[in-house]
Amino acid sequence: MKKILLLSDTHGHVDDHMMKYVNQSDEVWHAGDIGTTQVTETISSLKPIRAVFGNIDNHELRLSFPEELLFECEEINIYMTHIGGRPGRYAKGISEKIKSIKPKIFICGHSHILKIQYDKVNQLLFINPGAIGKHGFHKVRTMVRFEIDKSDIKNMEVIEVKR
């Protein structure tokens, strides 16, 4: 079993509240718009991190992280990218990719809008953790944590932080 902390859109921001949850996880997944290498260096000094770059990320971050990640955690296939849209309105090329690779979880960021939804059409769990950084229009900063136990996704929780 693995405890996962999922975050996105840090835009260079790291704070003690976020790091408290990093410490409680086994792995941290970042869905892009990291902002600075300090973010990933701080997290990876404590826990393994899987990340994709986002549209605001500089050349250095784009060299360090891919635009999309396809990986397996326990017995679950995951597809993560920064700009993904949402069920019923996926970004260009995403629907085709999902149909091709058939992930059990699809993760994206970009919108700063927290959304967790089962996509019945593609039979996957869609997760956008919202934004944990301070830049943007969002009024509440959010992260998502959950556990993966073999082929089960459980104990999903939204963590809200005041701006």
PLM feature spans:
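Conserved beta-sheet core of the metallophosphoesterase superfamily
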Residues: 50, 89-152
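N-terminal active-site segment of His-dependent metallophosphoesterases
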Residues: 1-49, 57-67, 73-77, 139-142
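Active-site environment of divalent metal-dependent phosphoester hydrolases
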Residues: 12-16, 34-39, 56-62, 85-90, ...
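Beta-strand-turn-beta hairpins that frame and shape the catalytic cleft
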Residues: 1-5, 70-79, 119-125, 148-157
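Redox-cofactor binding/interface segments in oxidoreductases and associated redox assembly factors
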Residues: 29-30, 81, 108
